[in-house]
Amino acid sequence: MERKTFSQLPLGVSDFHKLRELGKIYVDKTGLLYDLITTFEKVFLARPRRFGKSLLVSTFESLFKYGTRDFKGLAIEKLWKDKTYKVIRLDFSNLKDFSTEEEFSFLLDEYFAILMAQNEITVSKEKSFGGFSSFMYWLGLQPSNSVVVLIDEYDAPLTVCMNNPGLFDFVRKKLSRLYASFKNYEGVIRFLFLTGITKFNKTSIFSELNTLTDISLSPRYGSLLGYTHEEVEEYFKNYLDRSAKALGIGSEQLLDRLVSQYDGFCFEETVREKVFAPWSLLSFFAEPERGFKNYWFESGGRPYALLEYLKSHALRHPEEYGNLKSIALSELTSSSDIKNLSDVALLTQAGYLTLKNIVGTTAYVSYPNEEVKTSMAQL
């Protein structure tokens, strides 16, 4: 019985249909999703790695593609009345294995050719220009308000070449064509959602898609990803009890230690809502007898390309970032040019630093918790 109960952790499951089908625990955020979808049509959300962005994209995909099939018992089940749509899901984490302009062009065409085949998208031979261009041509032919576009890790191919300005600019220009098509054919798109880590400037996302709403620091959606203290106690009570028993400590002492180790991430500008790193918390619950390990940083919070860029530009002494740092709030709310990228802004968007306070137009940031603090000291 215990084995069955504790197999319900959603650790490593980023497919919403699979999560629901297997009976994994799902912290119900669908009330927020409904609010988001019915308020905005084009949305951007920046969050660190391992915070559930891919699961969120998968949740949108299931809702728009299959309606409430996978949402039985969740808040949105009784609220959702919309029809189903053609859903195009783009995962740009598949566009990272390149080191030259030619390799990226080939990778991009190949990716979109596979995407079109998987989605049974065809164009006439005389209009077939390679996967990338053919997809944009197809999009322009679709009926009004008929397509949902979801982009996961939009910035992945850009992050790979942050240390190569020429290649970065080439990739930026290539992807700009795609984002420009979303602007040109916006009447076709019912809902557009982009997610990533960093808000790069001059990628035609934030300049051409001027109707794109950035909710990254919105107080309303500060807990959209990550677990609040209340959610942990409600959805993971059995795991809290089991973990306290495994470590031989009281439940209150356990919660205090979990807060210190894995909580403290703040993604909204009132600085009131704090959330746990979900990957760290779930990993701890899976093996509490191992103690309070540094799960987030080792599993995905340490992207090689990002750290290499920081080390070559500003991140000489990671321990210095343990002190409270000040930064203009506009550096977090506005998109960044790669040539003038602030190390503090980049570290904050990547999750190494988090909001501690905002006074006027100045944000104060520092390490969110002990896990990040100790991991950064080991760089």
Q: Where would I find each of the regions flagged by the language model?
A:
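Phosphate-binding site recognition
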Residues: 1-379
